[in-house]
Amino acid sequence: MKLTDNVHILKWVDEMAALTKPDEIVWIDGSEEQLEKLRHEAMGTGELIKLNEEKLPGCYLHRSDVNDVARVEDRTFICSKRKEDAGPTNNWMDPEEMYKKLYEIYDGSMKGRTMYVIPYSMGVVGSDFAKYG
C-alpha cells in the first residue's frame, strides 16, 4: 500500500528499499487498527509497557534502546564543500565522501527488518508552500 502519488517520494522510497533491502515495507496510514498492531508488536518486544489502566488509562511507557539514543561526537560530521563552513569545533567531511561511506554502511542494513514509511507534509497539504516527505 502506498499513500501518495508523488513520484519523487515513491522513487526515493524505492531507492532506499533497494539499498537497505528490508524484508517488508509498511506505509504508516495513521489508522487506529495500525496503531494497535504497532503497539502490540512493541509490547511483545518489551519496548512498550502498558501502564495501569485504572490509574493511567490509555498510557504506555516506551523505552529506547541505549544504543540508539546517544550522539557520538567523533562520528558526527558537518558535511559541506568547504571545511571552514563546519566551524572550528566540528568534524568535517566532504559530502561526496560521506555519501560513499553511508551507502556502504546502509547497503543491506534492513535485511530481516521492516522499513516503516511515515508520510508527512510541512505545511497545508495542497498548498504551494507545502513540502512533502
Language-model features: locations:
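Conserved internal helical-beta-strand scaffold that buttresses enzyme catalytic cores
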Residues: 1-133
